[in-house]
């Protein structure tokens, strides 16, 4: 029997459902697909390129808005064309990694062209705004304050940036509270110790006198990833953990200081593959950054980085688009057991009520958080439909963030944004102030751009999952500010001194100047 089908808009579909809502069963929770968990990881290069394009588009929209406010034409046509192509590559077989080889040859080549175009758009806006001086300035494109040290053209500079701002860099006298010895690196926050395999065997949180490592962190492991017919690129065998993994072999290691960071450098190998790794402690930084350069030449293997925190919980908090979700770390029922690999965007966090550890990343999305383990899936090597999938060179960064506060009261969200949005440094001088500020830390101004009407759009969301009343301050002159839907329709008046957000609610402001 084939039911009658009627084409309609999503709005009319849901309006019809509302009339009969009492007749339908109700389910609260995530509709987890018990298939295709490999798509969180397969074809890592296309996933990284997608992330970089999204980041550059975000930066371009904001900086072009700043230039637009000073009289420069906003590049609507160019940005729209790039957005459409980036969204095309988010098609359900391209971005997930389940297309044929030709698709990735073509789209990865196109990504490079798109990134070059976006960098040109950004640089043109910056050039329009800046003054020509014999100095340097940094630009911060996220809704968080940032401070620290940056290296540019061989010189070190100090910066202190408000959200969505730019400021002059000052030449810096580098700090001296960094130390290292054999198998040890240390800053004012942490003392990190390594074993003879290159794994982290101790992370001492100096402020809380607490070692958050149970057995090891940064365990670089190779797991069997057998062909699940016919969905090799799509699926991971649920029983893969029953096969004992192999550790990548540590070949060389050293410790040293570079400017404001103390670094442990590891070189690993396995068969024809190799990994160069830098574990970095930076002055005043509350997290440990791990940069990875992989030459990957395996078949039906997974490269995963495993961590066993001393603190664990029945729940893991996972970053998703415009919010977060709790998932189970248990395996004692069919639903929880089936969720052996879970997706997350910028981080996953396990907090036991007293202490927590987050694993953050800049382009990796597959995680296993079960039985005391946090495992980041870094690379796969399927043979169908692309027999060369993921073979080659890869660069990615992950981070370890130990914390004693609750996740949403800690710096977790900020660090996720910092890791995924590096500073840009330019010659000259430029002083940009944020056009809007919010007095509540769990309201994030996510996007600033110019809409098709020529008005400034400010999109923000609630990130902690709680009802919030916030004051939003405008730092520019305006004729009117309206709250609208995402299509800039159904405009209503808004009280900027008392904006009410539902948990994870997205709000859009339209500013007419």
What kind of region is each of these model predictions?
Residues 44, 48-51, 74, 99, ...:
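Conserved aromatic-histidine-acidic binding/catalytic patches
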Residues 9, 86, 398:
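Conserved, mostly hydrophobic/aromatic
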Residues 1-27, 52, 64, 68-78, ...:
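Catalytic-core region of carbohydrate-active enzymes that cleave or remodel glycosidic bonds
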Residues 57-163, 447-448, 453:
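Histidine-centered catalytic/metal-binding microenvironments
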Residues 4-6, 127-513:
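C-terminal (or distal) subdomains of carbohydrate-active enzymes
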Residues 44-60, 111-126, 200, 279, ...:
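Short, Φ-rich (hydrophobic/aromatic) sequence segments
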Residues 24-84:
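Structured, charged N-terminal subsegments at the starts of enzyme catalytic cores
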Residues 1-40, 433-442, 451:
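C-terminal domain-boundary segment and adjacent tail
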